[in-house]
Amino acid sequence: MPSLGLGTWQAPPGQVNQAVCDALELGYRHVDCASLYGNEAEIGAALQRAFQSGLVQREELWITSKLWNDCHAPEQVRPALLRSLRDLGLEHLDLYLIHWPVVHRHGVLMPERASEQIPLEQMPLQDTWRAMEALVDEGLVREIGVSNFSAIKIDSLLQHARRRPTVNQVERHPWLQQNALLGYCQHQGIQLTAYSPLGSSSSNGQPSLLDDPVICAIAEEHRASPPQVLLAWGLATGTAVIPKSVHRDRLASNL
């Protein structure tokens, strides 16, 4: 898996297609997707453009998607994957993740009441994981992993797993370093991938990591941009990073 990839969370509709094409032209070979993001069909159109033009071959790319919380029932896992494959226009994924260790009732994307959630005691993660393992057996997925899992959740999963998670994808940056989780994953041979490596989106006047005085000072000293400093920190500390942008100049700068 390439250590630097393109994140597509909150990529605006109508812009992500061109962003993916630009990223592939610039040299990105890792694209991170998820059914929840609602843009896999647009990403798929960009991938098909790239394949048909000869820009890249399928085997050159690493494509990740994620199982949403309302499809944890074992009988729902394969259909959810097939929908992502259909939208992306692919025959297989390189990596498929359980998006969160949380279960919603089927068809509920974002629960508004407790009754729309299902306790893990009623739908254990290990049952979902067995269905994920079956996707690898079938050749629909090369690797499987998790996202937003704590060390405790991974430990519990490992007690029942036939295949170990390849990746745990979590938010990680200098303001949320998660070093204990990083050390745990490294000990277990699990690659930690950092989403929001440039910090969470700021709003309501909250400070931005990109404006952090220490980050800005390091950037100035090394004649780099704050995003370049943050991505270098993530890579140097052992994580893969998947920054998101739909702007070609920023995509180039992040490489």
Predicted regions and their residues:
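N-terminal binding-site loop/beta-alpha segment at the start of enzyme catalytic domains
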Residues: 1-61, 78, 131, 198-202
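Active-site mouth loops of central-metabolism enzymes
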Residues: 2-15, 66-75, 116-123
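Short, acidic/polar
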Residues: 11-24, 73-88, 125-127, 152-156, ...
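Residues at the N-termini of beta-strands
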Residues: 30, 92-95, 143, 167
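Short helix-capping segments at alpha-helix termini
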Residues: 49-59, 88-90, 135-140, 160-164
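A short, structured active-site edge motif that brings together acidic residues
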Residues: 57-71, 95-101, 169-172
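Beta/alpha (TIM)-barrel catalytic core signal, keyed to glycine-rich beta->alpha loops juxtaposed to Asp/Glu
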Residues: 69, 101-255
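CE4/NodB-like, metal-dependent polysaccharide N-deacetylase domain
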Residues: 77-98, 134-138
